[in-house]
Amino acid sequence: MKRVGAHVSIAGGVENAPLNAQKIGAKAFAMFTRNQRQWHSAPLSTASIEAFRRNCEEAGFLPQHILPHDSYLINLGAPEVEKLEKSRKAFTTEMQRAEALGLTMLNFHPGSHLNLVSENECLATIAESVNLSLNATAGVTAVIENTAGQGSNLGWRFEHLARIIELVEDKSRVGVCLDTCHLFASGYDLRTPEAFDATLAEFDRVVGLSYLRGMHLNDAKQKLGSRVDRHACIGEGMIGREAFVHLMQHPAMEEIPLILETPNSESWAEEIEMLYSFEKE
């Protein structure tokens, strides 16, 4: 089964996320486990944790279909010691929050070198950050998201992802989430079935399809290789409808979270319905 969903709100408490996902006909969802614009958050209450688990169970969401995302403030490759320590502490806390909620994954953007250190040094720092958090937790997989390659962000080449994975000690607890907009923006074409398959084959060659834990489904507002991260609604951007029809029929997309982050949350229910209709074309 294809597990399409969206990145839903946790307003009023994390326990509302599965309810919000259910309302839009989702079969998977993403969420933040706290306010992602702040460094510090109050610990999750026992009541919230229990309500979250109960709501997930009642709505039929299994842990492997839920892909929480860490705060955008975190930079696990930060060249400055103070920012790096702050990021590592925050990331470990988020891994622990995911663990407390009974979840098995945490999605994160790799990090940025800020033009202060080399790419290789930054990738090694990111991997060491992941190792520290994995050692401080149990059962939660760190899921690296590919990036569009804006600024000094790393993770826009498959080789970056492969290098981080190579340096992570526990390979059973590291994975990848591929964002279609980020792929396209960083130069990986998806527009035709042939282009889509070639990109997936390249990912398999460099990283390995066995590491694929989820997808973010977004069309792109900018052209191929623009290195600009601007999401568009499905079928309304430069990637186009055909890519998403092929994705919804692709066997590699079975039973992993396929998460919409398109600009208009009001249309997510319609986009989910549309994506499911693509399976039948």
Swiss-Prot record:
Zn(2+) 2 binds at E145, D179, H216, E261. Binds 3 Zn(2+) ions. SMART domains: AP2Ec (SM00518). Transmembrane segments: none annotated. One of its GO terms (biological process) is base-excision repair. InterPro entries: AP_endonuc_2 (IPR001719), AP_endonuc_F2_Zn_BS (IPR018246), Xyl_isomerase-like_sf (IPR036237), Xyl_isomerase-like_TIM-brl (IPR013022). Zn(2+) 3 binds at H182, D229, H231. Keywords: DNA damage, DNA repair, Endonuclease, Hydrolase, Metal-binding, Nuclease, Zinc. Its EC number is 3.1.21.2. Zn(2+) 1 binds at H69, H109, E145. PROSITE patterns: AP_NUCLEASE_F2_1, AP_NUCLEASE_F2_2, AP_NUCLEASE_F2_3, AP_NUCLEASE_F2_4. Its cofactor is Zn(2+). It holds the Pfam family AP_endonuc_2. Signal peptide: none annotated. One of its GO terms (molecular function) is phosphoric diester hydrolase activity. It comes from the Bacteria. Belongs to the AP endonuclease 2 family. Endonuclease IV plays a role in DNA repair. It cleaves phosphodiester bonds at apurinic or apyrimidinic (AP) sites, generating a 3'-hydroxyl group and a 5'-terminal sugar phosphate. This is Probable endonuclease 4.
